[in-house]
Every structure is written in C-alpha cells, then in structure tokens.
UniProtKB/Swiss-Prot annotation:
Keywords: ATP-binding, FAD, Flavoprotein, FMN, Nucleotide-binding, Nucleotidyltransferase, Transferase. GO terms for molecular function: ATP binding; FMN adenylyltransferase activity. Homodimer. ATP binds at T9, F10, H14, P15, G16, H17, N92, Y119. This is FAD synthase. Disulfide bonds: none annotated. Catalyzes the transfer of the AMP portion of ATP to flavin mononucleotide (FMN) to produce flavin adenine dinucleotide (FAD) coenzyme. Its EC number is 2.7.7.2. The keyword Plastid does not apply. Belongs to the archaeal FAD synthase family. It is an enzyme of class 2 (transferase). It comes from Methanocorpusculum labreanum (strain ATCC 43576 / DSM 4855 / Z).
Length: 140
C-alpha cells in the first residue's frame, strides 16, 4: 500500500485545502494528513481555529484516510511512524523541495517530495484571503 503524507495548518478550511488533499490522495492508496500544532505555526499568524477542531475537520473529509496532529517537538516523528512513499506540500507552503529532501535523507526517511499546484477554481482559496475579506466586509 502506497502511503501519502500531506501536511498543513488547515486554518479555516477552504476549496484550496480540499484540492491539495484530493490531489495528494491521487498519488497513492492511503492519505495521511499531519495537522500542524498551534505552537509550531511560527511562519505566519497563529491559527484562528484550534488544533483539535482543525484535526476533526480534516478527519471528516472523504479523501482523508488518517489524520493526526503533528508532534510538538519533532516534526519528523510522525513521518517516521507513518513511513510514507510520498510527502506532498502545497503550492504556497514555505518549504523548499530540495531542502526537505535533504532533511529527510539526513534522517534516513525515504520519501519522495511532490509540490501540489495551486487551485484556481474559486476566489477564496486561502485562509488569509478569507480573513481579509471577512474583515473588509465587517468594517464597512
């Protein structure tokens, strides 16, 4: 069975997230999703939605076979435990594919890295865009 791992914050679930996960699932037989812990989200504003609620939403998606919270101290721990063939990253995730591949190899994790393209089928395909629009509409 070919396992795929997708990772993300998934704050304010939107069509871009669904696209990312559905495209990730197409790469294998079993999709595992690692949902970022609140304390580990340091590259952008803290999530609005709690990690438990974000996990529950991801677990409810048809394309997701398993969803777990990330480890609070070692982001590679769940990846080692899942042992995926492929790790997907979203089009706007800050990872460099080359750096991630090197980090995985350094830890003896044999997984390919695939960046999923951007979904452009709808206007609100990022949490930031949704938040900005909500603020704009409510402060008129």
């Amino acid at each position: 069975m070919k396992k795929i791992v997708a990772t993300g914050t998934f704050d304010i679930l939107h069509p871009g997230h669904i696209y990312y996960l559905e495209e990730s699932k197409k790469l294998g037989d079993e999709l595992w999703v690692i949902v970022a812990r609140e304390k580990n989200v340091v590259h952008k504003p803290r999530p609005i939605v709690s990690e438990d609620q974000r996990l529950k939403m991801i677990q409810s998606l048809k394309c997701v076979d398993h969803a777990v919270l990330g480890d609070q101290t070692d982001m590679y721990k769940p990846i080692r435990e899942i042992d995926p063939a492929v790790i997907t990253i979203g089009f706007n995730q800050k990872w460099s594919e080359e750096k991630l591949r090197a980090d995985l190899a350094e830890r003896n994790i044999c997984a390919d890295v695939v960046r999923i393209s951007e979904y452009t089928g709808m206007p609100f395909t990022s949490s930031t865009k949704i938040i900005d629009e909500a603020v704009r509409r409510r402060t008129k």
